Amino acid sequence: MNKKNVRISALFVLISTCAFAQEKENVASEQVLEEVVVSDSKFALAKEKSGKVITKITNEELNNRPGQSVAAILNTVAGVEINGNQSAAGKNLGYYIRGGKNSQVLILIDGIPVNDASGISIEYDLRLLPAEQVESIEIMKGAASTLYGTGAATGVINIKLKKSDKKSVSGNGYFSVGTNATAIHQNQKASDFNQGFSVSGRTTKTTYFAALNSTEIKGISQIAPPNSNVSYEDDPFSRLNYLAKIGYKVTNKLTLDFFGNYDQIKNDYDGGFDNTGTSDTNLNKTSSKQFRFGFSPKFKYDKGEFVLNSS
């Protein structure tokens, strides 16, 4: 009788131990798959714990859409409309979330609000930003005035730029050529050129990232009617972008991050349509430049961290 009791007890111990090991494995896998967002609370938060409707475009999804602009990628998100993204290169863009106008949508770059003071509604020009410099995009749909002010009445678009790689030194380069054909004019000549490169890495105390990107597009005329004998000029578009980031670890608790960014676009635009082409001249030009720099110290303490973003 005693021997049977001992054997049964040993069997139960083995079963309970195996079940416990399986439980730990499931918990570990759930932590790895957790998707984190920051637009909702300005702090890293699990997406399923967010009280807002947030769509995140990951770096993997961006890499699967080569050649597309930031505006074209955003236009694929339900509830987001980027007016003008399917038009000729250089076309001015309007962005709308749930029917709200440009001034009711806030654009963030690395968590910092950006705008264009030269415009009437001072909204940020998405044409300035190349998709090759973007790490991920978060779109929060719905009012967020309590966090970001009245400029976020219908939504927030938080664009996170790329940063240093985990390797000591790494680099990346690309070059692409495309045509600029339309449904009417099947132009097969090379007229769309995109090129760029980046280098990043880290040492014991320093991280760095630098990127140079450029785009040159011959362009087309949007007002040229089909089968017309009137000559209309093409409207070229060019963009040049520099981005540099550097971080320094002062102590185990204090880190200093610096960044500098220069964006420039130039493009021609069409004059009024009069069926003669006389108003569509090469004098119709516009250009836009933006220079941003910032400093972001981060201090860690026992129960959290203090971060200051300035730009």
Residue ranges, per PLM feature:
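Outer-envelope beta-barrel architecture signal
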Residues: 103-105, 167-173, 204-208, 240, ...
